[in-house]
Amino acid sequence: MKLRNGSPEDAGMSSGRIRHVERLVQRWADTQVSQAFVTVIARKGIIVSHQAAGTASPGPESSPLKPDTLFPLASITKPITATAAMILVEQGLLSLSFPVSYYIPEFVGEGKHQVLVHQLMTHTSGMRNNEIGEHSRQKEALVDIPPADVNQHPMIHKRLFLGYDAPLWKPPGTEMSYCGYGVELLGEIVRRVSGQTLESFCRDHIFTPLEMNDTYFTVPEALYSRVIRRPEDAPGGRWYHTPEAMSSPSAAGGAYSTALDIAKFGQMFLNKGMYGNERILGAPAVAEMTRNHIPHISSTYGAQFFKEASYGYCWPINHNKKDSGDLFSPKALVCGGAGGVNITIDPHYDTVQVIFSVESKSNDGHNVWFPCMNLFNNAGIAAIEA
């Protein structure tokens, strides 16, 4: 099954309620809740809404936003990287139960030999961003960075090298702490095992078969004008539109894409690894990626503490952390990215919902994008009739 356009009734949804969702999004754009919104709602493989509202850049002279505008995916990049790793697992080239150090011998330090590849994808490796960042800053002042491999980006190589010998925060497998560096390690494993750059591997095995023709780890210069511009004081406003950001193939957050392309990626998971006649993953691999691997393990996320986390392989599972909507099933997969992007896939309702926007804050400092994401997702699910 491929995504196709159709009426809400074809998908068992209400036309009136879908129109309500579209009016809601348009009102948010018109009242400058956020500068820009591109949204997709699909059910049973049928796109019932694909909307663009707002402007392509801040300011009164900006042109209207187009549905094919490129947005930085930020952390939505992570499940793409995890999918690449699972493809290597299926090819018999990678084992998730092997130590990270088996594939990256430079990954050293007390207890580091106990960190397993699958723990990079559930954020239970025992690493934490704070410790890695502080260690890297101190190390950079003391050492010379060795040259990167021919097929390795210098910026990614530098980040990896500086963190290879960072100390663990906790023993592996004892607590979840969201760690982008762990997914950078996963991307490096994909590079070393496949012999390709992460982007090249994803292009061959994910983007091309999924017809994700507008998805890039390195945005071509000819397409820079299609990338959303955001106010400088918005989250990522001074970074996401720079040539450095658009050419930095970070496994944890470097991809750029359109809302429609990411909806295709989500539909592949609902199709148990298929898209049209193309198989990207086997059904067992999809099942492994989308089940909770860390029951009974607690989680810290910023200032929040959760007694029990719920995480697949780079896919957060709805379970008891309902911050992207109130009506999804407990099996829903919810992945957001810094700056204002979100995809939610609900296998129970057979839905894919994507909202790409520009994260902003109100005058009193409150984030006004997160409520929009929540409300959009609620209104979309509420359109289901049968």
Give the label of every model feature segment.
Residues 271, 290-301, 362-386:
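Short, gly/Ser/Thr-rich active-site loops of penicillin-recognizing serine hydrolases
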Residues 14, 78, 258:
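Short, conserved phosphate/pyrophosphate- and ester-handling motifs at nucleotide-, phospho-/glycolipid
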Residues 331, 336-345:
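Short glycine-rich, acidic/polar surface loops and turns
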